[in-house]
């Protein structure tokens, strides 16, 4: 509806949003209910695995998680993200930059797409960056 005036348009959804919704629908249909449960289990297990690789002082082990958690680093999270980017990692979201947490807090998300080896490499790189 790019060529239609805003007042006359019948919907406000753009092509990109519709394509994203269609892609999500296809993915969920292909997974099915059991597949979706399996993806959820993988996300949870891999998140807990990554947490187990980080020092206790960085992670609240009692915190309820699903596929993301907050790491409290010994350096500003933005600095850690920048250093990790140089190593080829997309590290997470510095919460302090959003005004949603302390400057040293990094929100890390884990999905079914990452292997245990990738998570081990990420944890090693994060420890190296933070302890430098």
Feature map (PLM): residue ranges:
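Generic C-terminal helix-cap and adjacent flexible tail
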Residues: 127-132
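Active-site C-terminal subdomain of aminotransferase-like
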Residues: 1-55, 59-62
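Generic signature of intrinsically disordered, low-complexity, basic-rich segments
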Residues: 17, 25, 105-107, 126
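Conserved C-terminal alpha-helix-loop-beta "cap" of PLP-dependent enzymes
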Residues: 34-51, 57-122
